[in-house]
């Protein structure tokens, strides 16, 4: 019965967040359901932040919510090409607020930096936009991208420019 109550809470909360975003869109991204029958899987398009290497890009991602949301974080995976130190090669986003609550077993993050149930779709996507503006190369998900970011910035810029161009071609 508890799983059913958690699913009901998650469903109600996600419907509310979707309604709020439809009523009051936020600059920098758009969001909706992948399939109208599944509130737990969202399609998000993030507009590359102005004055960054990602400026002009339109990057698609899938946000998948667990049945016990908001007690556990969603996963976010770019489906568009993305070259970034904090995005795994398979597109999964690696930022602190998407990590399960509690202490970090690796000691990189404070518990206060990790997931809390107060986060919303809006706060998650705004954190991803901030990540695009300011990569964290100290605990990278994509070691090669982080190394290029630090040591071969021109190569890094070329790969990001290619990803931006490809995202524009997909429109």
Describe the role of every protein-language-model region:
Residues 1-171:
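UBC/E2-like fold recognition across ubiquitin and ubiquitin-like conjugation systems
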């Amino acid at each position: 019965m508890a799983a059913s109550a958690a699913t009901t809470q998650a469903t109600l909360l996600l419907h509310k967040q979707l309604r709020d975003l439809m009523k009051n869109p936020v600059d920098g991204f758009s969001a909706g359901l992948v399939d109208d029958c599944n509130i737990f899987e969202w399609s998000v398009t993030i507009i590359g932040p102005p004055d960054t290497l990602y400026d002009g890009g339109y990057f698609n991602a899938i946000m998948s919510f667990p049945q016990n949301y908001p007690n556990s974080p969603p996963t976010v995976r770019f489906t568009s090409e993305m070259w970034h130190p904090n995005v795994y090669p398979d597109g999964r986003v690696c930022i602190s607020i998407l990590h399960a609550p509690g202490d970090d077993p690796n000691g990189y993050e404070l518990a206060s930096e990790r997931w809390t149930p107060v986060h919303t779709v809006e706060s998650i996507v705004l954190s991803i936009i901030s990540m695009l503006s300011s990569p964290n190369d100290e605990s990278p998900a994509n070691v090669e991208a982080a190394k290029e970011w630090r040591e071969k910035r021109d190569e890094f810029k070329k790969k990001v420019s290619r990803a931006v161009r490809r995202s524009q071609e997909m429109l």
